[in-house]
């Protein structure tokens, strides 16, 4: 069994959630257990202690861990999301959307994510 920690539940990982729900991994002989980590610190500690085998997220946490401990065994590898994962969501469908229509609107912006 592979235990995967995720720091953040987000739509950019939808293909992986779909693979899990449709049992695509088990159809190929893999048993994957996706667990939502309570916070980035537990993700690091869980990986180091063996409570999780892998996690997805940005490389920054691994880099910070190596800065504190150059002998740290954590490794950042692979690429799950190939583009900027931030998305714009509206209340109503708008097939004629244009960015200029956002002028004067209030937006919520994500500036820190727990990766």
Short names for language-model regions:
Residues 2-26, 37, 84-115:
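Bilobed "Venus flytrap"/periplasmic-binding protein-like clamshell domains
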Residues 27-29, 72:
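Short secondary-structure junction motifs
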